[in-house]
């Protein structure tokens, strides 16, 4: 966030093996969050709004996260079951408080409050190896809820000039409760001329959504979304806080990758694309595309140079207009190069 430069991670894991079975446990005494871009001029991707630390509702209870999984090895692959209980990696809009100076409401401020939903995940996965082909798949059910209730909102002080805006007049916690699922299917095979092909299909959808409303009368700014109050249906701006990062962009996507190595794997070329195929409310079969071309050259055993170009294309005719995620990201198209040295 804007006031923080680093976020620690502490976790532990235990794996137990018995014949063709594997049982694993994970535990973390702290909440591990996703690395969102900071407001740095040299970083090409930025959020339109940068929440400050005091705009977040702190997790009042102990933010313990834990999970376990079990897998069985088969003759041509494996199957697994996973469970996780913790907090979302991405923050969400938790609600809004309206403050003023004493009883005078003529100069009030809207305090947008963010938080992290409590999430439980139950998933299954499999890997199958058939000849030169590999099939991978996973599906997961997510139950997530915003644990910030009315009492927590009433206890909050204004995040902006609390000595002046010292009186809370209105409080609107969203209290989201959502059930959703995610599914990923992946196919890998070696094509002629030693070209590695990877194809992936991703989809997610909400199964059930409940929340309170936000009866506001002026426009507000929310990270990743500029929206008017008339359009501010909390269900419309719901974004999964856990699972595949593709879920932030679209509900349905196809990913294709081709990779070729030459000169004894010293030089590698990779062409990949992400296609938004969520076209239920749009005539264009592929509203947006992210295309990436990368090459990597190993100068010696320790030194590697990478060069890449990414082009992001949205659709000006998309029903969401400028709010369509890939339209927002078009300016993030970029050329990059980096030098890696391994000790």
Predicted regions and their residues:
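Outer-membrane beta-barrel "beta-signal"
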Residues: 327-343
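Residues on the lipid-exposed face of transmembrane beta-strands in outer-membrane beta-barrel proteins
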Residues: 12-16, 68-72, 81, 124-128, ...
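Aromatic- and glycine-enriched pocket-lining scaffold segments that form the walls
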Residues: 3-88
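Solvent-exposed loop segments that connect transmembrane elements
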Residues: 41-51, 91-114, 147-175, 209-243, ...
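Repeated loop/turn-to-beta-strand initiation elements of outer-membrane beta-barrel proteins
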Residues: 20-23, 76-79, 132-136, 194-198, ...
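Residues that define the transmembrane beta-barrel architecture of outer-membrane proteins
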Residues: 6-10, 62-66, 118-122, 129, ...
């Amino acid at each position: 966030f804007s006031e923080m430069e680093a976020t620690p991670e502490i976790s532990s894991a235990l794996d137990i093996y018995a014949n063709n079975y594997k049982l694993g446990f994970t535990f973390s005494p702290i909440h591990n969050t996703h690395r969102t871009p900071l407001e740095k001029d040299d970083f090409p991707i930025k959020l339109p709004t940068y929440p400050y630390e005091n705009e977040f509702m702190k997790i009042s209870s102990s933010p313990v996260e834990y999970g376990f999984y079990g897998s069985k090895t088969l003759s041509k692959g494996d199957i697994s079951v996973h469970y996780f209980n913790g907090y979302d990696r991405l923050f969400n809009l938790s609600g809004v408080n309206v403050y003023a100076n004493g009883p005078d409401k003529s100069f009030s401020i809207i305090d947008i409050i963010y938080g992290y939903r409590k999430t439980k995940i139950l998933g299954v996965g499999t890997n199958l190896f058939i000849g030169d082909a590999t099939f991978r798949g996973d599906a997961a059910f997510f139950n997530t809820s915003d644990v910030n209730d009315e009492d927590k909102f009433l206890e909050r002080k204004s995040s902006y000039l609390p000595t002046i805006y010292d009186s809370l007049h209105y409080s609107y916690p969203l209290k989201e409760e959502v059930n959703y699922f995610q599914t990923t299917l992946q196919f890998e095979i070696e094509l002629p001329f030693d070209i590695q092909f990877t194809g992936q299909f991703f989809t997610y959808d909400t199964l059930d959504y409940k929340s309170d409303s936000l009866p506001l009368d002026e426009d507000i700014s929310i990270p990743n979304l500029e929206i008017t109050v008339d359009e501010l249906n909390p269900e419309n701006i719901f974004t999964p806080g856990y699972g595949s990062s593709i879920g932030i962009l679209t509900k349905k996507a196809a990913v294709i990758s081709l990779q070729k190595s030459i000169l004894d794997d010293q030089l590698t070329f990779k062409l990949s694309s992400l296609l938004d195929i969520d076209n239920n409310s749009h005539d264009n079969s592929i509203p947006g595309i992210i295309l990436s071309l990368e090459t990597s050259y190993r100068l010696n055993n320790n030194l590697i140079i990478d060069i890449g170009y990414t082009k992001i294309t949205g659709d000006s005719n998309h029903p969401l207009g400028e709010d369509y995620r890939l339209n927002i990201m078009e300016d993030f198209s970029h050329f990059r190069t980096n030098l890696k040295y391994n000790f």
